[in-house]
Structure formats: C-alpha cells, structure tokens
A protein has these predicted regions:
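Conserved glycine-rich cofactor-binding loop
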Residues: 13-15
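Conserved glycine-rich Rossmann-like NAD(P)H-binding loop of the short-chain dehydrogenase/reductase
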Residues: 27-43
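The beta1-alpha1 cofactor-binding region of Rossmann-like NAD(H)/NADP(H)-dependent oxidoreductases
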Residues: 59-70, 102
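Substrate-binding pocket helix/loop in short-chain dehydrogenase/reductase
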Residues: 96-97, 104-106
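Active-site helix of classical SDR
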Residues: 120, 156
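Residue(s) in the substrate-gating loop at a strand-loop-helix junction
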Residues: 140
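SDR active-site lid
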Residues: 170-243
Length: 277
C-alpha cells in the first residue's frame, strides 16, 4: 500500500494517537485526526507543524452513538473514502473491583470496546461495497494479562480482543483486514486516564498492596517504549501486504502474551501477578 491513503485515527490529542497522526501524515497519508475535545488539539497542531505536515482535525467522541455516526458520515462526505481506521481512543480507570462503581466499568466499556464497535458500524458498509479497508485497534498487554488494580481497563481490553478476533474472519470475507496492536508500558502521560489510585483512600484495605503494585508499575515505566515507537508499528501494520491479527510491540510483551497462551490453568500468570502486590 504505497499510494496516499485516507487514514482516520481516534484519540489524537496526546500519546499514541498524536504520534500516529504525525507519523502517517509524514508518510504522505491524508490523516483525519480526531478527539473528543478540540480545545485539547494544541499539542497535535504543534507536532504537525514541527514535522511540516498537516491533518484534518475533527471532533469525534467514540462513546457517543449519534456523534460517531454523524462524524464518520461527514468524513466520508468530505474525503470520499476511509482506507484505514486506527481505533486508539481509550480511557484507563484504576482500582480494584470493590472500589469501582458500575459506572466506572460502564465508562471503560463504552469507550474502549463499544467505541470500536461504533467505528466498525460506520465504515463497514462502505468497505463491503469497496473492499480493501483496514481496521487497526490499539489494545494492550492488559488485553491478555489481567493486572491488579486495573480491573475495569483489563476487562475492556480483554473484550476488545475477543470482539476483533471474532470479527476478523468475517471481515476478511469482504477484503477487510483487522489487526490488534498490543503495547506494554508507554512513556508519557495517559491523559485520558480519568480516575486513578490518588482518588482511592490512602489508608483503606487495599492501600498496602496498591503501594506495592505502584512501585512495580513505576519500575516498568522506567523501561517504557515511546509513543513514536508505537506509531511506527501502527504504520508498518497499515502498510503490510498481509497483516497479522496480533502484534506485540516489544520482546517483553511477546513473552508475557506467550506465557498467557501457554498457561492453560492460569496458575503461572496468577503467580506472576500475585508477586506484583
């Protein structure tokens, strides 16, 4: 795929989405860079300007049925096509299940899972009529390995993995290729992480294990990948002649995901994650 493509990317106000928008635009693609709030587009505009490229920056809230549908319709009306979708928008909600409300779980699911569903609903009719689309979702090692104090986030990423693994062979019947990209720790602020341990009681029943897990997380982020590294892989996946279903972004993530698929009883994974707290 060497000709200019029309690439829609969600969650572009920061992090992986911002880096991906700059990368794809720098490679000559027509990028539609979307986010929930255009007031947060400053960093993206700066990144594009520094790279000497441009993008069509638009509002798109993937947690909203009507807004997502109308937003995609507008993109198709203005650009005529969407060749690649990078489903990147996501939120992280820290905490263990007892501490989190049902609304916390619902919010995570609405964006991280149903956001992808809404995007598929918007582009699949077009792709069936004109085969060749690519749907690439930013998942996580958390879609394979359940992690303490990440219950809602892991739930949503497990669900995303199941959704797209189920959808991929059906989509392929219409020439549509589906891939999941699974990063581990990535440097920079996860700006959409709307709730975190700081909002939990510092002296509650989970304070000590949370503190131990936070230390493990801090250590992991000392060796984190960069947003640019993940953006490069996303571009490679979009350019691949025969993209795979799953891509791990580092050797560490490959080992962890490999452990999960080999561990039929789950005890080795449980032993590993138990040591984190």
């Amino acid at each position: 795929m060497t000709e200019m493509r029309t690439v829609l990317i969600t969650g572009c106000s920061s992090g992986i989405g911002l880096a991906a928008a700059v990368k794809f635009a720098s490679e000559g693609d027509m990028v539609i860079a979307t986010m929930r709030d255009l007031d947060r587009a400053g960093a993206l505009r700066e990144g594009l300007a520094e790279a000497g490229v441009s993008a069509d920056i638009r509002v798109l809230d993937v947690s909203d049925d009507v807004g997502t549908a109308s937003g995609l319709e507008a993109v198709l009306a203005d650009h005529g096509r969407i060749d690649v979708v990078i489903s990147n928008a996501g939120i992280g909600i820290d905490g263990t299940t007892e501490e989190l409300s049902v609304d916390d779980f619902r919010a995570s699911f609405e964006t991280n899972v149903l956001g992808a569903v809404r995007l598929i609903h918007g582009v699949m009719p077009v792709w069936r009529a004109h085969p060749g689309g690519r749907f690439i979702a930013v998942s996580s090692v958390s879609g394979a390995i359940g992690q303490p104090f990440n219950d809602a986030y892991c739930m949503s990423k497990f669900a995303l993995e199941g959704l797209l693994e189920s959808f991929a062979p059906v989509a392929a019947q219409f020439g549509v290729q589906v891939s999941l990209v699974e990063p581990g720790p990535v440097s920079g602020v996860f700006v959409d992480k709307s709730r975190g341990p700081q909002q939990q009681s510092s002296d509650g029943p989970y304070a000590e294990p949370r503190g131990r897990f936070q230390a493990v997380q801090d250590s992991a982020f000392d060796a984190a990948q960069t947003n640019d590294e993940i953006a490069q892989l996303l571009w490679d996946v979009a350019a691949a002649d025969e993209p795979m279903l799953r891509y791990q972004t580092s050797e560490l993530v490959e080992k962890m995901v490999g452990l999960k698929f080999k561990d039929m009883s789950g005890q080795r994974v449980l032993g590993m994650t138990s040591r984190w707290i």
